[in-house]
A protein has these predicted regions:
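Divalent metal-dependent phosphate-bond-processing catalytic cores, especially two-metal-ion Mg2+/Mn2+ enzymes
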Residues: 2-152, 172-202, 213, 223, ...
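Short alpha-helical hairpin
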Residues: 147-167
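His-Asp-centered metal-binding catalytic motifs of divalent-metal-dependent phosphohydrolases/nucleases
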Residues: 184, 202-242, 248-258, 275
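Intrinsic-disorder-associated, low-complexity terminal segments enriched in Asp/Asn/His/Tyr and depleted
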Residues: 365, 376, 388-389, 413, ...
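Short linear motifs in low-complexity or flexible loops
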Residues: 367, 371-379, 383, 400-402, ...
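Periodic, rod-like helical contexts
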Residues: 374, 383-387, 391-399, 407, ...
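Polybasic, low-complexity intrinsically disordered segments
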Residues: 403-418
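Non-Sec secretion/translocation targeting segments of pathogen effectors
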Residues: 426-428
Length: 428
């Protein structure tokens, strides 16, 4: 029924395996031969067409007919092992996957198939700001001083299966770090684009890479280590080890506790502002979830959590909130401008075009370049995203805030809750 589509996907998987120089796939012919084992085509047929978010466990079921030919099954299971294996690739020597050599061939095969299938998912379902990334196109990143570091970031993000690891982590751990990171990237980039469109100077490549990397250090923390303190260090190490000092300077210094907000760059402010507004809580079933709050609401949530802390810490957060409120006022002042040309005389950028890369710089992202990516999707798919702004769907707000000033204004009071299986009683 989906013969052509299956051939296309098999070809993409074979090309990906060959590009990574897998020892078990020395040629495209050998890679395709792996996908001819009994059960593969039938399993892929059951997954097509893709109409919703894929589960890593379902992709593992697809791979179950191939994996025994490559490696024995890890004691903890393939999903848990591959989560730790990907962390070990990011942070060698941390002991996340001590038996990696025995299972490496199977892990690489599964992670590559998962990457291809998630690329397909991204093109099939509406954009979700708590799961997806809209990265800059090759043409766009070349405009910025940090463009070369940005290319290195996108390459590492894909080569080390960073996105796939975060999706796996959602199914193998109780944590939902992806939602927070993606949400921060969404807010930071919306703010940065609006500021640039208003004629101010901001490096979008630097903002994008720093926002997408700012909490990756959490995956480098070993059991027993203090994640709130050490994740800055591991973020710094991951970025510096891949030749991204400028990105590291922004990403690893986003704590609001020890920074002098009066001396921060525009890129740092975009990240700290976005991070302040992206909070993790619990839904009615007790599951961790990410919510993007308006600034004032986020501040009051923080204050409630700080009821039992000393006055010095409380005053620090009040100071930070005041500075970020000033930043919002600054953005509102920019919202009144409608320049024909951006800073430096160049035409004001209108956002990435339809051929811009997806969340990892791979396949083009069909949602990029639209004012509201969900607007063209069927109603039942749009409902999955569950974006709201002061009680109204975000799409209505974006329509009301069209134009250059809208890009600045539309994010100021944005409130987004996770769409992933929210449960029947979760208030939106």
């Amino acid at each position: 029924m989906h013969e052509k589509l299956i051939r296309e996907i098999n070809g993409e998987i074979a090309d990906a395996l060959l590009a990574r120089k897998m020892p078990f796939a020395p040629s495209r012919k050998a890679a395709l031969a792996l996908l001819k084992v009994p059960g593969w085509t039938e399993g892929l047929e059951q997954m097509l067409p893709i109409r919703g978010r894929l589960e890593c466990a379902h992709v593992l079921e697809l791979c179950s007919c191939v994996l025994p030919r490559l490696a024995p099954r890890p004691e903890e299971g393939w999903l848990a092992f591959c989560t730790q294996y990907a962390r070990e690739r990011m942070y060698p020597g941390q002991g996340f996957a001590p038996d990696r050599e025995e299972y490496e061939a199977g892990a690489l095969f599964f992670l590559t198939v998962l990457q291809v299938m998630l690329d397909r998912e991204r093109r099939a379902v509406p954009f979700d700001p708590l799961k997806d990334f809209q990265f800059l196109s090759s043409e766009e990143m070349g405009e910025y001083e940090c463009g070369e570091e940005y290319r290195r970031f996108l390459a590492a993000f894909r080569e080390e299966y960073v996105y796939e690891m975060m999706r796996l982590s959602e199914e193998t751990t109780p944590f939902r770090t992806l939602g927070h990171i993606a949400g921060v990237h969404y807010i930071a980039m919306t703010v940065a684009r609006g500021i640039r469109e208003a004629g101010e100077n901001v490096d979008l490549a630097l903002v994008s890479a720093a926002a997408a990397a700012h909490d990756l250090g959490k995956f480098g923390c070993r059991p027993g280590e203090r994640v709130p303190l050490l994740h800055y260090y591991y973020t710094d190490q991951w970025l510096l080890g891949r030749g991204m000092p400028a990105v590291s300077h922004i990403a690893a210094n986003h704590s609001t506790w020890d920074l002098e907000l009066d001396t921060l760059s525009m890129e740092s402010l975009c990240l700290i502002y976005a991070d302040f507004r992206s909070k993790q809580g619990r839904d009615e079933q007790g599951r961790e979830t990410t919510i993007l709050y308006p600034l004032e609401e986020s501040f009051h949530i923080i204050l409630r959590k700080l009821e039992n802390v000393d006055q010095a810490k409380r005053r620090r957060y009040e100071f930070v909130y005041g500075k970020l409120h000033d930043f919002e006022d600054y953005m509102r002042s920019l919202g009144g401008r409608r320049p024909d040309r951006a800073a430096g005389g160049a035409e004001a950028p209108q956002g990435p075009g339809p051929d811009a890369p997806g969340r990892d710089g791979g396949q083009p992202d069909p949602a990029v370049g639209r004012a509201q990516p969900e607007a063209d999707a069927p109603a039942e798919q749009r409902a999955e995203v569950r974006q709201h702004h002061r009680g109204r769907p975000l799409g209505q707000e974006l329509a009301a805030a069209a134009g250059l000033s809208g890009c600045v204004r539309r994010v100021l009071h944005l409130s987004v809750r996770a769409a992933e299986d929210p449960g029947p009683g979760l208030p939106l």
